[in-house]
């Protein structure tokens, strides 16, 4: 299949798993968070420990969602719930946002220790689209989007960035809802 880029006015790309190979870092951070937390709960309640499943749980409950929504959805799958808390909750708080902060700490460590690279074919495509004059946006629920795009040297390619900070600020629904992509299209003045 060949794409005729001249037929498009813009390119909107997800970050994790499309531009950069960060999905594995996110998955590992989620696993560490939930395995640690579930072990704590199992010890406290004297119930069996069932680990977070990277294949099923990651894809179904947390992939691409804002952290607090991923925590909520995964815990609900285990018939558990926590108070939402607030975005300012620290990682020591047993709230949806607090557990989200723990996941963020695990992700930051993995990012520092292993780094991140961009997919070469995606980089070629992005440069081609930019050379053709297309407007460009990066869309991600990650709060580290700007840092990651800068690390891989691609920040100058994008006219617009809608990331986890903007999703929180604008109270947009996380994926699979299209809200963040629609916001990027609006900012680019492009009809989706």
Short names for language-model regions:
Residues 2, 128, 152-153:
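A general structural signal for stabilizing positions within well-ordered secondary structure
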Residues 12-15, 126, 154, 188:
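Generic leucine side-chain signal with a strong bias for well-ordered alpha-helical environments
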Residues 134-135, 143-192:
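Substrate-recognition "cap/lid" segment bordering the active-site pocket of phosphatases
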């Amino acid at each position: 299949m060949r794409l005729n880029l001249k037929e498009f006015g813009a390119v909107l790309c997800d970050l994790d798993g499309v531009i950069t190979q960060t999905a594995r870092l996110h998955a590992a951070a989620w696993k560490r968070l939930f395995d640690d937390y579930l072990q704590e709960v199992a010890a406290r309640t004297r119930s069996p420990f069932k680990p977070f499943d990277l294949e099923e749980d990651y894809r179904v409950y947390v992939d691409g969602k804002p952290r607090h929504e991923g925590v909520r959805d995964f815990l609900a799958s285990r018939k558990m719930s926590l108070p939402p808390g607030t975005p300012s909750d620290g990682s020591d708080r047993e709230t949806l946002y607090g557990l989200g902060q723990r996941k963020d700490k695990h992700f930051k460590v993995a990012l520092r220790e292993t780094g991140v690279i961009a997919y070469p074919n995606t980089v070629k495509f992005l440069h081609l689209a930019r050379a053709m004059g297309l407007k460009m946006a990066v869309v991600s629920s990650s709060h580290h989007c700007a840092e990651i795009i800068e690390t891989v040297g691609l920040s100058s390619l994008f006219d617009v960035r809608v990331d986890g900070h903007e999703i929180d600020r604008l109270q947009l629904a996380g994926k699979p809802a299209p809200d963040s992509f629609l916001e990027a299209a609006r900012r680019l003045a492009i009809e989706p």
